[in-house]
UniProtKB/Swiss-Prot annotation:
Species of provenance: Zymomonas mobilis subsp. mobilis (strain ATCC 31821 / ZM4 / CP4)
Family note: Belongs to the GreA/GreB family.
Family annotation (NCBIfam families): greA, PRK00226.1-2, PRK00226.1-4, PRK00226.1-5
Alphabetical list of HAMAP family matching this protein: GreA_GreB (MF_00105)
PANTHER family: TRANSCRIPTION ELONGATION FACTOR GREA (PTHR30437:SF4)
GO molecular function: DNA binding; RNA polymerase binding
Domain of life the protein comes from: Bacteria
Any GO BP annotation: DNA-templated transcription elongation
Protein name: Transcription elongation factor GreA
Keyword set includes Transcription: yes
Name of the gene this protein is made from: greA
Presence of keyword Lipid biosynthesis: no
Keyword set, alphabetical order: DNA-binding, Transcription, Transcription regulation
């Protein structure tokens, strides 16, 4: 059996997953209580509260399994320990768009991505176009709204 692929993530991404895992673990006893309470109402075949609680239990267990799997395969990266002149995972990249408007993105894992928050996945079209590039490189990115062009003006590891 092949080793499972590592999932790169920042320290903040790991903490976000650990916080969500703790929240889900805390929800487990509440769901069990809801199942027991609904079970006490009698006939389970037409007991909507029972079925809703069992469905929620299944959802929570699936989410716990998913998060535990991600954490077990996590390759946690601290961008402050990185350096270099190329865009890599964890880098913060300053760009100029076609209108010379400055934009800044940090290259992160899929679970951490939030484009409006300045964090893009290394697997996103822009993330893939940036990886391995240097300052003053021009890149073209095909997105659903059309092609976009950027100039890399600065690379930081913060």
């Amino acid at each position: 059996m092949a080793a499972q692929e590592k999932i790169p993530m920042l320290i903040e991404g790991q903490q976000m997953l650990m916080d969500e895992l703790a929240r889900l673990h805390a929800e487990r006893p509440k769901i069990i209580d809801a199942i027991e309470e609904a079970r006490a109402h009698g006939d389970l075949s037409e007991n909507a509260e029972y079925h809703a609680a069992k469905e929620r239990q299944g959802q929570v267990e699936a989410m716990i399994g998913d998060i535990e799997g991600k954490l077990s395969r996590a390759l946690v990266i601290d961008p402050k320990t990185l350096s270099g002149d190329k865009v890599i995972f964890g880098a913060t990249v300053h760009l100029l768009d076609e209108d010379d408007k400055p934009v800044k993105y940090q290259i992160v894992g899929q679970t951490e991505a939030n484009a409006k928050g300045g964090r893009i996945s290394y697997n996103s079209p822009l993330g893939r176009a940036l990886i391995g590039r240097k300052v003053d490189d021009e890149i073209e990115v095909s997105v659903p709204s059309g092609d976009r062009y950027y100039l890399i003006s600065k690379i930081e590891f913060i």
